[in-house]
């Protein structure tokens, strides 16, 4: 009887939580094998930014939601591997029609997943989308994220000024950290533009996501509380549940960087996939094929 009561209670709780998330209208291109791919998208929608939005840009300068951070996780053979996908990567969103992943979201989630499939052969079994406000809430709810900097990093536009070394960032600082595009590092006593460019932004986003995944609570009560706070700022594809998301928390297979051609600075803002791009995605199990 106790087991039955617990089962009913958990089912009811799951149903209640699911109702707090928006459902995405999108036809996913799922895996052709027994593996699963989860794609997490952090969208830059200034209308849904946290309080004090001037820290992250003027609302009047931005229209519509863009894919700002993109993380792909692959679960297969008892391992979970992940890769941070460059937002400036050019993909085919429709036959002979191209767009950057970031701005493809302006067309809707269908164009985004079609682009991943057509250009990268990346299936998507689960899609989770979170806005800026939700990102800040999530980071604060898990007690911040731990990052390590080789050099001090500052970016006036992202409102960050961080020392070298290992440190814990709160939600607002973590958001500035992953969104920094005009950062400077202190090396040899001189502040110089961050030599990593867009690749550094990709790496920082991956570092923060890894820290978040490691810190997701295992206790069901704590997990429920976290989900209750963040799901209103989240959109999920049909058939994607909280348990599906939690199932990807352990990156036992490691994290893969995704090299691209171009897209490394403000003057060169379009990145192209090349053989190294496809090899990295294949290594992570993320290019297993799909059908549009």
List each language-model region with its residue ranges.
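Non-catalytic, solvent-exposed segments at the cell envelope interface
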Residues: 1-292
């Amino acid at each position: 009887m106790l087991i039955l009561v617990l089962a009913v209670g958990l089912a009811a709780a799951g149903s209640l939580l699911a109702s707090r998330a928006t459902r995405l209208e999108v036809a996913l291109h799922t895996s052709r094998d027994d593996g699963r791919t989860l794609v997490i998208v952090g969208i830059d929608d200034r209308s849904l930014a946290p309080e004090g939005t001037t820290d992250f840009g003027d609302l009047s300068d931005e229209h519509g939601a863009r894919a700002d951070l993109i993380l792909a996780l692959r679960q297969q053979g008892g391992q979970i591997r992940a890769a941070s996908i460059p937002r400036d990567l050019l993909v085919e969103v429709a036959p002979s029609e191209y767009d950057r992943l970031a701005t493809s979201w302006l067309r809707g989630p269908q164009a985004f997943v079609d682009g991943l499939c057509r250009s990268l052969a990346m299936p998507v079994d689960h899609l989770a989308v979170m806005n800026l406000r939700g990102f800040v809430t999530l980071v604060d709810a898990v007690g911040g994220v731990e990052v390590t900097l080789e050099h001090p990093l500052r970016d006036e536009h992202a409102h960050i000024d961080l020392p070298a070394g290992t440190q814990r960032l709160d939600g607002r600082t973590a958001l500035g950290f992953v969104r920094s595009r005009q950062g400077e590092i202190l090396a040899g006593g001189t502040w110089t533009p961050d030599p990593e460019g867009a690749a550094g932004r990709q790496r920082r986003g991956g570092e923060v996501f890894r820290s978040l995944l490691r810190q997701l609570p295992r206790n069901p009560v704590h997990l429920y509380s976290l989900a209750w706070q963040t799901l209103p700022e989240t959109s999920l594809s049909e058939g994607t549940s909280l348990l599906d998301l939690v199932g990807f928390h352990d990156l036992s297979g490691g994290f893969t960087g995704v090299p691209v051609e171009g897209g490394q600075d403000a003057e060169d803002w379009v990145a192209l996939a090349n053989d190294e791009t496809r090899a990295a995605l294949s290594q992570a199990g993320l290019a297993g094929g799909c059908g549009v």
